[in-house]
Amino acid sequence: MFVTLIKPLARLHPRAWDFVQLVRLDRPIGIYLLLWPTLWSLWIAADGVPELKNLLIFVLGVILMRAAGCVINDFADRNFDGHVARTKARPLATGKISVREAWITFAVLVALSFGLVLLTNATTVWLSFGAVAVASLYPFMKRYTYYPQVVLGAAYSWGILMAFTAERGELPASAWLLFLANVLWTVAYDSYYAMTDREDDLKIGIKSTAILFGDADRLIIGSLQGLTLLLLVLAGNRFELGLCFYLGLAVAAACFVWEAWSTRDRDPQACFRAFLHNHWAGLAIFLGTVADYALR
């Protein structure tokens, strides 16, 4: 549906689709995985009634910053992507978009995002600098550490902290439970993603948790998902959430079980489908959160 909506962009200019691919608007899974935990937190921070202004700011901010993250990622990987089957057709790797054009795109996206943050409050504005720093750092970590997914987890969890400061003007200690839960969840699902490229990454020297975990990959991913659910249960208790929230967690748990089963042979395509499937887990938790507040 999302891709159908943006396809008319390809008709605006002969190169328009190249930029759509650069910012991954044709692959919205990253938007969903960043959006759901941000919205969990916005709803919880606002006790179920987020300000419309903040809701619009964070939805648009998620889209813009995810796009910016894709640009900086492709810049960092431009000399590697051509050697990986899944990424060899990316616009920077093929030369359809120049490095200069990519940097201009990145700057525009970050500037637009910052303009949105300026509509919140000083605490949230200060936090936004950390968001840009962590998001920019992640792509380069794949050269130096087997834990780039942890950095990605921090980047994908930063919106949780900003949602609380935007709604409450402060950052309660309990918000860190949601932050840590989302970091662990991100490491889990991005490890599935990394499993699809593991053989290519080994050849070109790119590091990932999928390589680090080795034959214990599925066991460790399942453990991370279990810890994610445990932390969310603790967060639910601290924020006094009810039955609907926990039903959402139960659906997410079922999603995780399906992912473990479907990747039992470690087929790269099955691992990629398991990665995509996490969208439904995040959506289930969000719907459970919304329903819990709505039915009070």
UniProtKB/Swiss-Prot annotation:
GO terms for cellular component: plasma membrane. The chain crosses the membrane at residues 29-49, 55-75, 102-122, 146-166, 169-189, 219-239, 241-261, 275-295. Pathway: Cofactor biosynthesis; ubiquinone biosynthesis. PROSITE patterns: UBIA. It is a multi-pass membrane protein. It is an enzyme of class 2 (transferase). One of its GO terms (biological process) is ubiquinone biosynthetic process. Its EC number is 2.5.1.39. It is found in: Cell inner membrane. It comes from the Bacteria. It catalyses: all-trans-octaprenyl diphosphate + 4-hydroxybenzoate = 4-hydroxy-3-(all-trans-octaprenyl)benzoate + diphosphate. InterPro entries: HB_polyprenyltransferase-like, Prenyltransferase, UbiA_prenyltransferase, UbiA_prenylTrfase_CS, UbiA_sf. Keywords: Cell inner membrane, Cell membrane, Magnesium, Membrane, Transferase, Transmembrane, Transmembrane helix, Ubiquinone biosynthesis. GO terms for molecular function: 4-hydroxybenzoate polyprenyltransferase activity. CDD domains: PT_UbiA_COQ2. Its cofactor is Mg(2+). Catalyzes the prenylation of para-hydroxybenzoate (PHB) with an all-trans polyprenyl group. Mediates the second step in the final reaction sequence of ubiquinone-8 (UQ-8) biosynthesis, which is the condensation of the polyisoprenoid side chain with PHB, generating the first membrane-bound Q intermediate 3-octaprenyl-4-hydroxybenzoate. Belongs to the UbiA prenyltransferase family. HAMAP family: UbiA. This is 4-hydroxybenzoate octaprenyltransferase. It comes from Pseudomonas aeruginosa (strain ATCC 15692 / DSM 22644 / CIP 104116 / JCM 14847 / LMG 12228 / 1C / PRS 101 / PAO1). The lineage of its organism: Bacteria, Pseudomonadati, Pseudomonadota, Gammaproteobacteria, Pseudomonadales. The gene is ubiA.
